[in-house]
Amino acid sequence: MATKTKTKTKKKTARPIKVTPPTAAQADSLELLKQLSEAVAVSGDEGAVRKIVREAVTHLADEVSVDAMGNLFAIKHAASSRAPRVLVTAHLDEIGFMIVGEGKDGLHSFEAVGGIDDRILLGKPVWVGEDKIKGVIGFKPIHLVKPNERSTVVKIDSLKVDVGANRTVKAGDRATFATPFVDLGLAVRGKALDDRAGCAVLVEILRGKYPVELIAAFTVQEEVGLRGAKVAGYTAEPDAAIVIDCTPANDLPSQDDDVENSHYNTKLGHGPAIYSFDRGTVSDKRLIKHLASTAESKRIPYQHRQPGGGGTDAGAIHLTRSGVPSVSVSVPGRYLHSPAALMSKDDFYNTAKLVRAALESWSPKVLKR
């Protein structure tokens, strides 16, 4: 009787993902994004990021100025005085914290600035102020926590920022999560990619030449009520506006693929997300069409953001003066408003590519009714 011999099956080994080296321009954009991400610039105290952006745009624009609110404007004039005025914006500020009490032994009370989930605060390292004083959000270790407390979310008003005995921290100082920027190959990880990614994209847009009067506005205080955008939109008097921001990606590790999220549908690697409408804006249909047709003609991947929650500076800009046709384009990002967000490098590059192409092909037909 013949005996059967077992044949060993070879285990399949995963092929390494090929990462295309960035071009020189892309490498410059990533380096700028790193600087922007690692700066401390919480709403109302955007000076550190504004300084970086100003240095980056001074040689790219015909005019650079800062208004009383702190908005930074960089203007590229068109050849014709009759050219349409197009406002393109990204916000400088990030969510974070404000020190509100000068405590003893380096322990300071603090409040959230912008939308932050209390669940993610415990034990997180922070940077305080432009000097990035190192601290940590203190909490009771598990040894001291009662069993019935372990399933309870600790509220922010019972936490402290601990900076040791450093006396240079004072009430009013801003703080952010202490997250270094990291290149992950196909993606990047960092804090405040909402909306430092948009700021880096807008700097890249300023490198182009367009048949429009381009008004680039780097706005302040978006995370606390679109306050800078209200002023910027009024000052610019644009014929149209494009807002560049970040939107929550829904392709999360904990998300059931079979469940449709009622507010967000974007995915990393699928291109910039064009808004139809959100909580604050119904995007102008003509601008949606122009962006989508531009993407298709230039073979730039894009996605339509599912109508629903959230909002951008467009919510304030479209209501200024007699009204401004507006649309938002966002870079999708995972884990926004947390210590570390994740963003596809291709989505980042393609957002700049799409808006540049849309501006280059601008004509009177874009806003024709």
Where are these regions (language model features)?
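N-terminal hydrophobic/helix-forming segments and targeting peptides
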Residues: M1-R369
